[in-house]
């Protein structure tokens, strides 16, 4: 039983460590996903969850996501924004 708890705890920790936070980035257009501060939170949350993140919100007119998989393209700064 203790082994099962330890394995579960390790898997949760690994998932947390490998998760990334950042602005959703469109590699093709080379820009971050635009939003309207405060009113764009629902769209950002939906787009972040679609990309595998835990949640998202609008920050500096771009969609900031928490808990994205490492394979999802992100930017650490809002930079140039574009519509999806």
UniProtKB/Swiss-Prot annotation:
It is found in: Secreted. InterPro entries: LCN-type_CS_alpha_beta_dom, Scorpion_toxin-like_sf, Scorpion_toxinL, Scorpion_toxinL/defensin. Keywords: Cleavage on pair of basic residues, Disulfide bond, Ion channel impairing toxin, Neurotoxin, Secreted, Signal, Toxin, Voltage-gated sodium channel impairing toxin. Coiled coil: none annotated. GO terms for molecular function: sodium channel inhibitor activity; toxin activity. One of its GO terms (cellular component) is extracellular region. Residues 1-19 form the signal peptide. Expressed by the venom gland. Belongs to the long (4 C-C) scorpion toxin superfamily. Sodium channel inhibitor family. Beta subfamily. Residues 20-83 form the LCN-type CS-alpha/beta domain. The lineage of its organism: Eukaryota, Metazoa, Ecdysozoa, Arthropoda, Chelicerata. This is Toxin Cll9. Beta toxins bind voltage-independently at site-4 of sodium channels (Nav) and shift the voltage of activation toward more negative potentials thereby affecting sodium channel activation and promoting spontaneous and repetitive firing. Has some action on peripheral ganglia, but not on other sodium channels such as those from cerebellum granular cells in culture. Induces sleep, suggesting a strong antiepileptic action. Disulfide bonds join 31-82, 35-58, 44-63, 48-65. PROSITE patterns: LCN_CSAB. It comes from the Eukaryota. Has the structural arrangement of an alpha-helix connected to antiparallel beta-sheets by disulfide bonds (CS-alpha/beta). Its main location: secreted.
């Amino acid at each position: 039983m203790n082994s099962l708890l330890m394995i579960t705890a390790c898997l949760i920790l690994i998932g947390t460590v490998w998760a990334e936070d950042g602005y959703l980035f469109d590699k093709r257009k080379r820009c971050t996903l635009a939003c309207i501060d405060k009113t764009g939170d629902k769209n950002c949350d939906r787009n972040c969850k679609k990309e595998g993140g835990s949640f998202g919100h609008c920050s500096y007119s771009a969609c900031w996501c928490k808990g994205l998989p490492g394979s999802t393209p992100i930017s650490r700064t809002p930079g140039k924004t574009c519509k999806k």
